[in-house]
């Protein structure tokens, strides 16, 4: 079989690039490992950092008819200026339509002739031309009621048209108010106050490599039944040679144990344990520098005020995942309450003792974990640096700082670990 016959007409890459994918995407577990390291291909983000999906629809059959068939959803989804323009045109069209009808009735009844030549009661009083008929239409639909123009019993058709215009006006008003209230009450804007960390990190947690990212709520109102989920999106070539440009793979964030449901009062670090079932099981730090994938993270819940479901989204490319880093603490106990410092929300500090190999190599005992004392030492340094900042602030207020017995005890217990004291941001 020739190369031309193997070419996929639906593939977005050339046949040479297909061959490259076959080499770099194969692995023992289907997700990586055993790769030939090449330079990273520049890929487009599928989900932007602000949650918008980077897609564009094209060649849709009967798009206008389908959108008009669901007019209410169309009005809710479009921008405010377009929605207000549509309703303004709807009002003008209805006023103009019934104005023309009343003018035609007046012409047919002879109401536009001079008063001395008529000799009978007009259908609509004080309507002597099209402009007067148009004003009468506006007064009828908006119930202004100036009192100069009114319909008489002379023409039943005119009475029927007044009733019809009143019904049409109520329908337009109801539709407009409903669409505006639905648009204003949408929980979409609630996602603007739900925050994701700029980067995700990979570090050890309880002796296992874990992928972590941080979420936060900028409002005091809660997100009811908040839960998170994540998906890994990457191109893949099947065993039959089919190229899938955006293959979606679920990432477990503790669904079976209920860990995906969170109480989002303070910022929380979401954790994905990189185990045998993880798509990141065979990826090491070196693989992370050359791999081509995107992790989409989703936070869902109900808005406390309206009980409507909202969804916040973000994503992390491979170069936005920091290997061997941890997030700086943002929650501190202060007097009789807890203080959340969002200036540290996106900040991380490096943990040099994090293994550079993949989780698969760790399971196969190809990497010797450092002693637990080293991790404890780094964690205590991080918190002691925070205590030092509190003591400096206390000294500025004129109160004597507390003695630094904790740090002396740490230096005495560290033994062979002769490291100089550094601030948290330098770890």
Curated annotation (Swiss-Prot):
Gene: Kcnj12
Site (Role in the control of polyamine-mediated channel gating and in the blocking by intracellular magnesium): 173
UniProt function note: Inward rectifying potassium channel that probably participates in controlling the resting membrane potential in electrically excitable cells. It probably participates in establishing action potential waveform and excitability of neuronal and muscle tissues. Inward rectifier potassium channels are characterized by a greater tendency to allow potassium to flow into the cell rather than out of it. Their voltage dependence is regulated by the concentration of extracellular potassium; as external potassium is raised, the voltage range of the channel opening shifts to more positive voltages.
Intramembrane region coordinates: 130-146
Protein name (Swiss-Prot/TrEMBL): ATP-sensitive inward rectifier potassium channel 12
Cytoplasmic compartment residues: 1-77, 184-427
Binding site for K(+) 1: 143
Keyword Cell membrane carried by entry: yes
Gene source species: Rattus norvegicus
Pfam family, one: IRK_N
């Amino acid at each position: 079989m020739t190369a031309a016959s193997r070419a996929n007409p639906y593939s977005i890459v050339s046949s040479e690039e297909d061959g490259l994918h076959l080499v770099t995407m194969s692995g023992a577990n289907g997700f990586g490992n055993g790769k030939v390291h090449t330079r990273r291909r520049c890929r487009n983000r599928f989900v932007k950092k602000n949650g918008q999906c980077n897609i564009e629809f094209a060649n849709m059959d009967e798009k206008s008819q389908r959108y008009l068939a669901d007019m209410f959803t169309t009005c809710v989804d479009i921008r405010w200026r377009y929605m207000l323009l549509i309703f303004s045109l709807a009002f003008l069209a209805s006023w103009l339509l019934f104005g023309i009808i009343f003018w035609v009735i007046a012409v047919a009844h002879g109401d536009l002739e001079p008063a001395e030549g008529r000799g009978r009661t007009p259908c609509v009083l004080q309507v002597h031309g099209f402009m007067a008929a148009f004003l009468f239409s506006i007064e009828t639909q908006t119930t202004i009621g100036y009192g100069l123009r009114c319909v008489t019993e002379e023409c039943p058709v005119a009475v029927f048209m007044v009733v019809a215009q009143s019904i049409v006006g109520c329908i337009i008003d109801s539709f407009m108010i409903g669409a505006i209230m639905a648009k204003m009450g949408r929980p979409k804007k609630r996602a603007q106050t739900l925050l994701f960390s700029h980067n995700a990190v990979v570090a050890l947690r309880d002796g296992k490599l874990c992928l972590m990212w941080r979420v936060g709520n900028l409002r005091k109102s809660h997100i009811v039944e908040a839960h998170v989920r994540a998906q890994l999106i990457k191109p893949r070539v099947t065993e039959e040679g089919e190229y899938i440009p955006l293959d979606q793979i679920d990432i477990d964030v503790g669904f079976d144990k209920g860990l995906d449901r969170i109480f989002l009062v303070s910022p929380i670090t979401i954790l994905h344990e990189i185990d045998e079932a993880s798509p990141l099981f065979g990826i090491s730090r070196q693989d992370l520098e050359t791999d081509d994938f995107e992790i989409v993270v989703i936070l869902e819940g109900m808005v406390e005020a309206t009980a409507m479901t909202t969804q916040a989204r973000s994503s992390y490319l491979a170069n936005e995942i920091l290997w061997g880093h941890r997030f700086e603490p943002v929650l501190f106990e202060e007097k009789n309450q807890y203080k959340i410092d969002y200036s540290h929300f996106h900040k991380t500090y490096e943990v040099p003792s994090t293994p550079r190999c993949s989780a698969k190599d760790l399971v196969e005992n190809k990497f010797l974990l450092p002693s637990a004392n080293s991790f404890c030492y780094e964690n205590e340094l991080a918190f002691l640096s925070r205590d030092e900042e509190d003591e400096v602030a206390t000294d500025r207020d004129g109160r004597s700082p507390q003695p630094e017995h904790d740090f002396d005890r740490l230096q005495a217990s560290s033994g062979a670990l002769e490291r100089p004291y550094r601030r948290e941001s330098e770890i």
